[in-house]
From Swiss-Prot:
Location(s) in or outside the cell: Host cytoplasm, Host cytoskeleton; Host cell junction, Host plasmodesma
Organism: Tobacco mosaic virus (strain vulgare) (TMV)
Protein family according to the UniProt entry: Belongs to the tobamovirus movement protein family.
UniProt-listed InterPro entries: TMV_movement (IPR001022), Viral_movement (IPR028919)
Lineage of the species this protein comes from: Viruses, Riboviria, Orthornavirae, Kitrinoviricota, Alsuviricetes
Protein name listed in UniProt: Movement protein
Alphabetical UniProt keywords: Cleavage on pair of basic residues, DNA-binding, Host cell junction, Host cytoplasm, Host cytoskeleton, Host-virus interaction, RNA-binding, Transport, Viral movement protein
Gene: MP
Tagged with keyword Transmembrane helix: no
Amino acid sequence: MALVVKGKVNINEFIDLTKMEKILPSMFTPVKSVMCSKVDKIMVHENESLSEVNLLKGVKLIDSGYVCLAGLVVTGEWNLPDNCRGGVSVCLVDKRMERADEATLGSYYTAAAKKRFQFKVVPNYAITTQDAMKNVWQVLVNIRNVKMSAGFCPLSLEFVSVCIVYRNNIKLGLREKITNVRDGGPMELTEEVVDEFMEDVPMSIRLAKFRSRTGKKSDVRKGKNSSNDRSVPNKNYRNVKDFGGMSFKKNNLIDDDSEATVAESDSF
């Protein structure tokens, strides 16, 4: 069963283009292309993990240009029997940022009893094409109180992004304002049965601790390598964090196809 619900991403929910930008050919407007990426997947096997995610999968970039991550739709499904206890926090991370509170772009909390969940994130910031090719985004996942034997996959996540590719810097308005996601906030994005730990510990603090632990392990590994003169492959550590300053909304609006799509444009 596919994780993503059939249907199209509604680009107008992320980007507010002017009438002129919609009507004029691309050669007469700074907006060259609004695109939806291919679906990227993460299979979560560890309780705490920091995973690479390709939010620009299938997106055609412009040399010496920019790409704006206007919006992101995340769909998750618990691979568990009904009415299991526990829950998860999912956080989008910009790995370029060294301060943990600045690296966390937004977070979402839900319980394992919620079999399938979906939320929307509005990062609305641009990076250069050169940085984009380095795959700068990660996903921090923290699962608590889910009792499953090691080596199995309790949770699957899928990601589809809406981005704008252009040569020159532009300013685009958003149809919705950025909000902090908390239980009882302006948008109800958490379940009542979610464990209290998810609200008590900010994801930025979890990210800082995770980075500190993995950094120490990396130093120990380097010391062993120099003494044994033998290379040791790096493990792909994963983690979860708190989304500060992002707007999420439950909405069934992802495309299940594996192809990137282009909208509101005729050329690059």
